[in-house]
């Protein structure tokens, strides 16, 4: 018996089509807030289970509405919002960020050109890690962490190195563990305060200890302070930039949590400290903004 090709010379062999896989750079990237756990929860919801989702800070679904003043301002400004803004974001909003921090005693001075607006803090985290990290650079990140920091570091070619926040010490960072994990490849340290997910609010003593380590090893400080106005039981928030005005510090914040508008994606990042030591980094930010 002859094969099909001999019987029908007009028939061509089946072409093997290209398969599109995810990029290799994603192999070490995980983001469980939107990964398998979230997918399992959605599947259980479809099966009729009532799932209480604690994975994302999303106050709107629990009936916490945005303040009326924000809603009114958005509606009033819609007719004037069709055009592109400057690459760093609209000037009135950046000016408002400067004014906000001028009201905080001890916060180092910065100006409107040091402020970047983003599609939430998440976009700004990715922008900063892309501008800062070369392949193999290490970033110290708290454990447990907000997983975007680990994912963004990996996606940018860096290596996340996790330092311990000890549950038996009220979830405070272990300064000893941080010191043990600094090496010649360490480029930055992430400080999430108030912390997500633990809720810990760090004392001045802890923050000064972290600043001392960053100062000794000339690390950039990446201060995630999105929950700075969500405080309980008399807790007081202290900014990293306040205790480390001599260090290059990127402070991240936004409207999402304090003003219950996470869906509006309104975040900012500003740089404080000796910016002359970060001119190339700033040029990278301006390129990506």
Task: Label the model's feature ranges.
Residues 47, 156, 216-217, 247:
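Helix C-cap/helix->beta junction micro-motif
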